[in-house]
UniProtKB/Swiss-Prot annotation:
Quaternary structure, from the entry: Homodimer. Interacts with mef2.
GO cellular component labels: nucleus
Reaction(s) this enzyme catalyzes, per UniProt: N(6)-acetyl-L-lysyl-[histone] + H2O = L-lysyl-[histone] + acetate
Comp. bias (Polar residues): 189-205, 295-314
Role noted for this protein: Devoided of intrinsic deacetylase activity, promotes the deacetylation of lysine residues on the N-terminal part of the core histones (H2A, H2B, H3 and H4) by recruiting other histone deacetylases. Histone deacetylation gives a tag for epigenetic repression and plays an important role in transcriptional regulation, cell cycle progression and developmental events. Represses MEF2-dependent transcription.
Name the record gives this protein: Histone deacetylase 9-B
C-alpha cells in the first residue's frame, strides 16, 4: 500500500487555462496594469483545484482501503471455510476407518463363534454316536452284572467248595470229584499273579475243571459278568498258545496234540481205577504255575482247560507234595533254609519206576508234558545220554560215597553233608519205598540252585580237579621263589644265617615231598598274614582267619590231618617268603 497522506503544493508559473472568448492582448501596457489582480485570482483557483484533487485522492484512498478490507475479510472467511471443510473430511475419514476396523473385528468374532459352534456341534454328534454304540452293545450283550452279584456268586462258589471238602473228610486238600466253577474275576494270567517263593499260592492249590464237568453238572445259570468275556478268553488262549517265554525257548514237544490228550485221559482213568482207596491227588494249579513261570506252556488260562496228571500220581500215591508247593525258578535264588524234608530228583525217578503203569501211557505222558511240569529228568533217561567213559566215573563215585557213609556210621558222628542220591539209590531196598533225605540248612542264600543231576556233579568234580592242579602249580612257584630269596639272603649275609637256612631247606624238602604224596582233598585259598606265625601249631585250620574254605569232599581222617598240617606249614612258608621279599 502506498502512503497518500503527503500533500504536494504545485504553483505553476504559466497559467493553465485562458478564457477562449477573450482575444489575445499583445499590449504591454494593459498587461502590466492588470497582471497583479489576475495573478492573485489565478493563485486562488489553483489552490482550490489542489484542494479538490487532495480531497478526491483521500476519497479514493478510503475507497481502496474499504475494498481491500472487504476482500481481505472475504478471503479470510473463505480460508476458514476451507479449513473447516478439510477438518470435517479428516474427521469423517477417521470415523470411516474406525467403523471399518470395528466391522473387521466383528467379522472375526463372528467367524470364531461360528467355528466354536461347529466344533461343539461335532463333539455333540460324536458323543451321540458313542452313546448309540454303547446302547447297541448293551442291548446286544445284555445287562452287566453288578459288584454285589459277583460277590454273592463268589460266596456261593466258596461255600460249595468247602462242602465238597468236608464231605470227603479232607479239609486241606481238594479231591478229584470236587468241581469248582470260575467267574470272570478268576480269568487272570499266571504271569500277573505269580506264586511266592515260600510256597504255592491259593490259586495254585485249586484243581482246574475239565470240559466234562461243565456238561455234566452246572448248578447255576450261565450268566456273563462282562460283555466282552468271550472275546477276551479267546484272545488270552491265542496269546498263551503263541507266546514264547523269555527264559526258555519254545519247543515242538510242548504243543499238545489230540493223541497226547487221549493218553493223559487214559492215564487218569487207569490211576483212579488201580488205586481207589488212595489219598487225594495233588493240585494241578502248582503244575500249571510252575510250567507257566519256568517256560512256555500249552495250557490256556480259561475256563475250558485240560487236566494234566498231577505229580503225586507220577511219584506215587503216598508221596508228599512239598516239592510241588515249593516255587522254583532257574533265574531266582534257591532258598531252602528252614525247609522240611523234600524229595530229591533221583528218588522221584525211583518212585516213577516203582509205579505199575502201562509203559506206553507213561512214555506218551513224558513226551507230551513239558520238562517244567515233569520236574528233573529221571536217572534212567539221564544214564542213556551219559557215555561209557562217564559210567566208570559214576561207579567210582558211588563206591567212594558208600565207603564214606560206612565210616560215618561206624564212627557214630552226625554227617556234615546229606547222603548223595547215588548212595540212596544203591542202599534203598526195592520192596520198601525210599525215604526222602533232608536238606542241609544253608547259612546264607545262594545265587544259583543246587546241583540236581549227575552231569552237574561231574562238572563240579572236573572243576575241583582243575583247581587242585592250579593250586599245586602255585605252591611249586612259591617254593621256587622262596629258594631264590634264600639264596639272595645267603649271598648278602653268608655267615649269619648259614646254619638256619640249611635246616630250613631240609625241612622244606621233607614237607614238599609229604605234600606231593598226600595233597589236600578240598580246595583251600590261603591268605598269608604275619599274625599266623604267633599262633601255636595245635590250632586247627578253620580257626585261622587267613584261610577260606571253598569246597571240601569228606574223606578219611588221616587225609584231613595231613591237610591241616600241610596248610599250617604253607602258612609258615608264606611268612618266610614275605620276609625274603622285603
Amino acid at each position: 500500500m502506498h502512503n497518500v497522506n503527503n500533500s504536494v503544493d504545485i504553483k505553476p508559473e504559466v497559467p493553465l487555462a485562458l478564457d477562449p472568448g477573450s482575444p489575445l492582448d499583445l499590449r504591454t501596457d494593459i498587461r502590466m496594469q492588470g497582471s497583479a489582480s489576475e495573478v492573485t485570482v489565478w493563485e486562488r483557483q489553483l489552490q482550490q483545484e489542489l484542494l479538490l484533487i487532495q480531497k478526491q485522492q483521500q476519497i479514493q484512498k478510503q475507497l481502496l482501503i474499504t475494498e481491500f478490507q472487504k476482500q481481505h475479510e472475504n478471503l479470510v472467511r473463505q480460508h476458514q471455510a476451507q479449513i473447516q471443510e478439510h477438518l470435517k473430511l479428516q474427521q469423517e475419514l477417521h470415523v470411516m476407518k474406525q467403523q471399518q476396523e470395528q466391522l473387521e473385528k466383528e467379522r472375526k468374532l463372528e467367524l470364531q463363534s461360528q467355528e466354536r459352534e461347529l466344533e461343539r456341534h461335532r463333539r455333540e454328534q460324536q458323543v451321540l454316536v458313542l452313546r448309540n454304540r454303547e446302547r447297541t452293545r448293551e442291548s446286544l450283550t445284555g445287562a452287566v452284572a453288578s459288584n454285589e452279584v459277583k460277590q454273592k456268586l463268589q460266596e456261593f462258589l466258596l461255600s460249595k467248595s468247602t462242602k465238597d471238602i468236608t464231605l470227603n473228610g479232607i479239609p486241606q486238600k481238594i479231591t478229584q470229584s470236587s468241581k469248582l466253577w470260575y467267574t470272570a474275576s478268576h480269568h487272570t494270567s499266571l504271569e500277573q499273579s505269580s506264586p511266592p517263593l515260600g510256597g504255592a499260592s491259593s490259586s495254585c492249590k485249586i484243581s482246574l475243571p475239565s470240559p466234562q464237568d461243565y456238561r455234566d453238572d452246572f448248578p447255576l445259570r450261565k450268566t456273563v459278568s462282562e460283555p466282552n468275556l468271550k472275546v477276551r478268553s479267546r484272545l488270552k488262549q491265542k496269546v498263551a498258545e503263541r507266546r514264547s517265554s523269555p527264559l526258555l525257548r519254545r519247543k515242538e514237544g510242548n504243543i499238545m496234540t489230540p493223541f497226547k490228550k487221549r493218553a493223559l485221559e487214559l492215564l487218569e482213568s487207569t490211576a483212579s481205577s488201580s488205586a481207589p482207596g488212595s489219598g487225594p491227588s495233588s493240585p494241578n494249579g502248582a503244575c500249571s504255575a510252575l510250567g507257566a513261570e519256568n517256560g512256555p506252556s500249552s495250557l490256556p488260562v480259561t475256563t475250558r482247560t485240560e487236566r494234566w496228571p498231577s505229580q503225586s500220581r507220577l511219584l506215587g500215591p503216598e508221596s508228599s507234595v512239598s516239592m510241588l508247593n515249593l516255587y522254583t525258578s532257574p533265574s531266582l535264588p534257591n532258598i531252602s533254609l528252614g525247609f522240611s524234608a523234600a524229595s530229591s530228583p533221583i528218588s522221584a525217578a525211583l518212585g516213577l519206576q516203582e509205579k505199575h503203569v502201562d509203559n506206553g501211557a507213561v512214555s506218551a505222558v513224558i513226551q507230551g508234558l513239558p520238562t517244567q511240569l515233569l520236574g528233573p529228568v529221571p536217572l534212567s533217561v539221564m544214564e542213556t545220554k551219559v557215555s561209557s567213559s562217564h559210567q566208570a566215573l559214576l561207579q567210582h563215585l558211588l563206591q567212594k560215597e558208600q565207603l564214606r557213609h560206612q565210616k560215618i556210621l561206624s564212627s557214630g558222628q552226625s554227617p556234615v553233608h546229606p547222603p548223595s542220591p547215588l548212595a540212596m539209590m544203591e542202599n534203598s531196598p526195592s520192596s520198601t519205598r525210599p525215604k526222602l533225605p533232608r536238606h542241609r540248612p544253608l547259612n546264607r542264600t545262594q545265587s544259583a540252585p543246587l546241583p540236581q543231576s549227575t552231569l552237574a556233579q561231574l562238572v563240579i568234580q572236573q572243576q575241583h580237579q582243575n583247581f587242585l592242579e592250579k593250586q599245586k602249580q602255585y605252591q611249586q612257584q612259591v617254593h621256587i621263589n622262596k629258594m631264590l630269596s634264600k639264596s639272595i639272603e645267603q649271598l648278602r649275609q653268608p655267615n649269619v644265617h648259614l646254619q638256619e637256612s640249611e635246616e630250613e631247606e631240609g625241612e622244606d624238602c621233607q614237607e614238599h615231598a609229604m605234600q606231593e604224596e598226600s595233597s589236600p582233598s578240598g580246595g583251600v585259598i590261603r591268605k598269608h598274614s604275619p599274625q599266623n606265625t604267633s599262633r601255636s601249631p595245635t590250632i586247627p585250620l578253620d580257626s585261622h582267619p587267613g584261610v577260606i574254605r571253598v569246597k571240601e569232599e569228606p574223606g578219611a581222617s588221616d587225609d584231613e590231618t595231613m591237610a591241616n598240617q600241610s596248610s599250617y606249614i604253607h602258612q609258615v612258608k608264606g611268612r618266610m617268603v614275605i620276609q625274603a621279599m622285603i
